A protein has these predicted regions:
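Extended, well-ordered alpha-helical scaffold/bundle regions in very large, multi-domain proteins
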Residues: 127-178
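Acidic, glycine-rich two-metal-ion catalytic cores of nucleic acid-processing enzymes
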Residues: 1-110, 171-220
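Short, amphipathic alpha-helical "recognition" segments used to contact nucleic acids or chromatin
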Residues: 118-127
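Short, surface-exposed acidic
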Residues: 101-118, 143-159
Length: 220
């Protein structure tokens, strides 16, 4: 950040509207990402407190609440799930109720906090195609080490999630089929058009019949 300070004391960076792998979150470039400045101190210093607004201005820090799973549910047409969330139910509890994991009247976070940890990991990990090994790692990271699963438990969670969420799995298939079709003609740059009209480009697309891979930055 210090290296990016201009003579007028401003700091600038680029904004990528679909920069993060897998989730498509906004991101920055060149090692500076204003969309993900650490909340906690790093080596005794708060990065956020290093930023100050100009004279007569205020700085606002805003966050989109659980935007990825909300958009995923919209894109795949899971409006029953979105209906639960719109009704004021915690998103991870809504997942538990929609998939039959939780049926109690009391809020999940009060009655079954361990189950909420699992639902959070399922929503944020399995919703984006995690396999068993990766899901075990993601679940542990997302819950601060509170959720540790055996390989067998991870495999079961992956299988159950995909069986319980066929609309999400179908969306994955549609996206992959579109890229595969594009790559038949232009494997060096396959393009997917979002609902917003913005393109997402994948470079050097390879399909070995089992796995589809590509790069979001040319030459990587």
């Amino acid at each position: 950040m210090i290296l990016r300070v201009r003579p007028d004391h401003r700091v600038s960076t680029r904004l990528k509207y679909c920069g993060a792998p897998h989730t498509g979150r906004w991101s920055g470039a060149g090692g500076l990402n204003f969309q993900g400045i650490p909340r906690d101190e790093v080596e005794g210093t708060s990065a956020k407190k290093c930023l100050t607004p100009g004279k007569g201005r205020v700085m606002v820090s805003a966050d989109l609440s659980q935007i990825e799973p909300r958009v995923l549910a919209y894109l795949c047409g899971d409006f029953d799930f979105l209906g639960l969330v719109r009704g004021g139910i915690d998103l991870y509890e809504a997942h538990g109720r929609a998939t039959g994991l939780y049926t109690e009247d009391e809020p999940m976070k009060d009655l079954a906090p361990e189950l909420r940890h699992l639902c959070k990991a399922r929503v944020l990990g399995l919703g984006y195609g995690c396999g068993p090994k990766k899901f075990g790692e993601v679940a542990q990271a997302l819950t601060g080490g509170k959720l540790n699963m055996t390989d067998a438990e991870s495999r079961k969670q992956v299988k159950d999630f995909r069986n319980q969420n066929p609309k999400i799995v179908e969306l994955w298939k549609k996206c992959e089929d579109n890229i595969r079709e594009e790559a038949k003609h232009t494997p060096e740059c396959a393009t997917m058009i979002c609902k917003s009209g913005k393109p997402i480009r994948y470079f050097d697309v390879k399909d070995d019949g089992r796995e589809l891979t590509g790069q979001k930055v040319r030459g990587q």
